[in-house]
Amino acid sequence: MALKYQRILLKISGEALGGEKGTGFDEPTMDAICGGVKKAHELGVQIGIVVGGGSFWRGRSSGKMERTLADKIGMLATVMNALAVSDKLEQLGVQTEVFTSITMPQVAPAFTRKDALRAMEEDKIAIFGGGTGNPFFSTDTTTALRAVEVSADIMFKATMVDGVYDKDPHKYPDAKKYDTLTFTKVLEDRLAVMDGTAATLCRDNKLPILVFDLADPDNIARAVQGENVGTLVYEG
């Protein structure tokens, strides 16, 4: 099957790397997720990845800590997860390059659009750590920003739910799943796709988002080939 997308930006939540516990690294889960990424990469698509830091740190659970400091710790957590995903993919025979938004040359080079594009054109998976480098911005916003910067065709948001619903499907059995949505509806109805900053950035730059379930990592390859997976959010 032909590729529907030539270049994607994939967001993986930090909690996903922790398996059922949602913390640290769960080896079988890491194997499965990175195996799914490898399968998609072997189809010929160029891939960039942003990994959240929630398996180690969540700023909203930081108690009385000052917000900017809590967010800085969260940024460092995303760097740890970026390095872990890179290592796992390399073990599977996939070349990667990690870039950070925070200057730490002993760990990884700083992000530039030119270097990220070069890496992907060299058939490497580009992995972005450190968030945007600024507090108050989510890793969803980081993913949207990097996707726009590298001219990705689409942003993939891999979650633990098989798409976007009108209400929480874990709490409400009658929740309705959307196959497609417009950014206008997402923003007006405040649907739980991503934060408003990220959604607005995608809308303004006409960057579609595909939200799908990472419980089956093969969904990444299916989505790249245009199969009906998850919920597609676009500017209608």
Predicted regions and their residues:
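C-terminal catalytic "cap/lid" subdomain
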Residues: 1-236
